[in-house]
């Protein structure tokens, strides 16, 4: 943060501090109040194909701004995709554990959300995990959520599934639910990407090496089970 070099008496500088603190406190109060109001119209429920909280296919960026307010909605935001793509969309709850990004079918007018990305802000620009991050509140009715361990995801699917090896743009993405509970055939409305734990034991490091690369692996693979990846991001497709 840029600091101003002020030449003033210590007593004058001290006298200015309570006002500044009060302004900061009031600013936080306004933001907190606005977000509390927004949460009254957002249940953080994911229904693949239908909605993600208040976001539906019929929604526009302008409508979200009216509904949730500028404290929650970042309009015309840069959204980074695979292979270096940069797209323009909308971000909700930017730089928080509830961060959500929206890409539209009509990208010019930002209408008709097509893809909704649940991407919690949990690491800094260098990839270092942020301390004391609260769990994201987004969840499906089946309980699928960010941070869910591989084994629990298997249990909720009802059987093992396939996922891509780690270490590349699509690494950790579920490629086939293998006829389980989350299998919707060719119409995939919920895509899930898993990632290895932030800290690894020597055995887990060896396991990661064996399940990396652009090949597919079963979740029941012994090395995959030892590695114990968790759900890192989710992508929801909304139907017209």
Regions found by a protein language model. Name each.
Residues 1-14:
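Sec-dependent bacterial lipoprotein signal peptides
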Residues 17-166, 170, 174-240:
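Short helix/turn-capping signatures at newly exposed starts of structured segments
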């Amino acid at each position: 943060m840029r600091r101003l070099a002020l030449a003033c008496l210590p007593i004058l500088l001290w006298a200015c501090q309570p006002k500044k603190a009060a302004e900061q406190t009031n600013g936080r109060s306004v933001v907190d109040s606005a977000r509390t109001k927004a949460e009254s119209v957002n249940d953080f429920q994911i229904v693949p194909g239908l909605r993600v909280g208040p976001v539906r296919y019929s929604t526009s960026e302008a409508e979200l701004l009216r509904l949730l307010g500028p404290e929650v909605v970042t309009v015309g935001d840069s959204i980074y995709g695979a292979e270096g793509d940069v797209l323009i969309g909308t971000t909700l709850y930017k730089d928080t554990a509830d961060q959500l990004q929206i890409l539209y079918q009509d990208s010019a007018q930002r209408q008709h959300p097509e893809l909704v990305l649940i991407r919690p802000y949990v690491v800094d620009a260098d990839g270092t995990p942020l301390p004391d991050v609260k769990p994201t509140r987004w969840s499906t009715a089946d309980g699928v959520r960010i941070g869910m361990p591989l084994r629990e995801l298997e249990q909720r699917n009802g059987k093992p599934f396939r996922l891509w090896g780690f270490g590349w743009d699509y690494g950790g993405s579920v490629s086939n639910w293998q006829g389980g509970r989350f299998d919707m055939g060719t119409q995939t409305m919920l895509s899930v990407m898993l990632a290895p734990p932030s800290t690894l034991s020597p055995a887990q490091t060896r396991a990661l090496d064996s399940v990396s690369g652009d090949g597919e692996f079963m979740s029941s693979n012994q090395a995959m089970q030892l590695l114990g990846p968790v759900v890192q991001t989710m992508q929801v497709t909304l139907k017209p």
